[in-house]
């Protein structure tokens, strides 16, 4: 391992195509990390494992771009928030009305539909939901009283799977030319009247809040048509948007990999250089301790520590540092043994300079090229180790790391069920991130080690 000046390393690196490819991939990953930090709220991390926070998304939906390659279009997930509101009042009744319009142009039925609302009212008003279909038929979906309140706010979700919705539809079976008992509410609503076939066109959902108080109103509402494709990466079994997990997983992976690599390389560098420079019994004792740590099986110990102490991502980073410095220490010691025999180091000793000053001024600067290469090469190992622990269920569940996504996919049998969009993207991100640092590390290693040059 030669000691190449840093300016020469830079000049050589820009001529290395593999190294530049690695830099390009790494720059892209940093841009993705910045996008995640700027566009996705931090609260998403706290709600990642809360099913209530993802109810408005579809379950195990394919990526939306899949429709570009299909002749029969799969229904897209739609969240409608813009409604036409109106208020009608008489001496006895107040009717607050909402109207959601949607053009449905797909070749399959939606998964479900959900009406979510927050209403402010007093008493026990009547909630009525109906839909005007493209063929002009009006279908009543729901008609029931809301819980009695005295001027308070009420939040509720009405699902197409509710028994009350299905019963109302069965009562209108004379409008359809096929049996309704064994099919879902969304299939009835979005089907032609004569045959069970998708009816495309404009659907208008009407919501009415009928009561005696003039203050009755729907403060906030949305209509969700549960599609089978959603977003760029799709969703998982818990309805979570996988693109959020992949985006947040990028800065987390870079933090884990870079923090562990820098920490372990710095520890190993200082430890090995000090042992090699001091020598004698100090060197012997330190190297025997190094051998003990080196002989420990890292993965079983990491599993035991994660189970018994903590599975926090920060504790895991510390554990990975503890087991990652020993190899660097051995190499840096051997390099320090060579450098300390040079004349300028001997001259510094004769002049009475302190050992710490000699190490910092004459030895460590010459090991920096090796340190940079070691950092780059160590990052993939840290990322894959964290992913492996998370895949085994020993990771930090509060953070959506790529390993945690793969663990959830394994738990729900994603591979066996053919949910490829839940398995391939996180695995691909782990591979690409590791590849970027391998390219950079190999390029640096080729520059600082002439024996590797072709």
Predicted regions and their residues:
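Gly/Trp-centered helix-boundary motif
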Residues: 1-257, 409-427, 431-432, 445-454
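Alpha-helical transmembrane segments of integral membrane proteins
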Residues: 235-454
């Amino acid at each position: 391992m030669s000691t190449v000046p840093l300016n020469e390393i830079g000049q050589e690196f820009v001529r290395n195509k593999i190294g530049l490819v690695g830099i390009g991939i790494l720059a892209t990953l940093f841009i993705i990390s910045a996008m995640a930090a700027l566009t996705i709220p931090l609260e998403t991390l706290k709600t990642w494992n809360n099913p209530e926070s993802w109810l408005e998304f579809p379950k195990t939906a394919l990526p939306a771009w899949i429709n570009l390659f299909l002749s029969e279009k799969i229904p897209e997930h739609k969240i409608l928030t813009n409604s036409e509101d109106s208020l009608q009042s008489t001496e006895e009744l107040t009717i607050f009305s909402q109207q959601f319009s949607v053009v449905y142009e797909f070749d399959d039925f939606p998964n479900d539909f959900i009406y979510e609302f927050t209403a402010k009212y007093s008493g026990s008003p009547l909630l009525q939901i109906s839909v005007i279909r493209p063929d002009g038929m009006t279908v009543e979906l729901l008609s029931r009283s809301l819980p009695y309140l005295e001027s308070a706010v009420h939040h509720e979700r009405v699902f197409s799977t509710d028994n009350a919705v299905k019963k109302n539809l069965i009562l209108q079976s004379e409008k359809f030319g096929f049996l309704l008992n064994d099919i879902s509410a969304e299939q009835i609503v979005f089907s032609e009247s004569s045959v069970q076939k998708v009816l495309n066109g404009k659907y208008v959902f009407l919501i009415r809040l009928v009561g005696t108080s003039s203050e009755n109103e729907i403060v906030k509402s949305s209509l969700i048509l549960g599609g089978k494709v959603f977003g760029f990466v799709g969703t998982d079994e818990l309805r979570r948007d996988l693109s959020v997990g992949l985006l947040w997983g990028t800065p987390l992976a870079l933090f884990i990999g870079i923090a562990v690599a820098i920490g372990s390389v710095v520890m190993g560098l200082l430890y090995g250089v000090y042992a090699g420079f001091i020598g004698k019994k100090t060197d012997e004792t330190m190297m025997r301790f190094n051998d003990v740590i080196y002989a420990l099986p890292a993965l079983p110990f990491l599993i035991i520590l994660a189970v018994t102490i903590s599975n926090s991502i920060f504790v895991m980073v510390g554990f990975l540092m503890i087991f990652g410095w020993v190899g660097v220490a051995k190499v840096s010691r051997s390099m320090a043994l060579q450098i300390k025999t040079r004349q300028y180091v001997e001259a510094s000793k004769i002049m009475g300079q302190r050992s710490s000053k000699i190490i910092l001024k004459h030895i460590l600067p010459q090991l920096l090229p090796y340190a940079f290469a070691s950092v780059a090469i160590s990052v993939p190992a840290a990322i894959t180790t964290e992913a492996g622990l998370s895949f085994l269920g020993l990771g930090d569940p509060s953070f959506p790391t790529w390993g945690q996504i793969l663990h959830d996919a394994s738990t729900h049998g994603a591979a066996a069920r053919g949910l490829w969009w839940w398995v391939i993207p996180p695995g691909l991100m782990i591979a690409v991130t590791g590849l970027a640092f391998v390219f950079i590390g190999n390029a640096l290693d080729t520059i600082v080690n002439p024996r590797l040059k072709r």
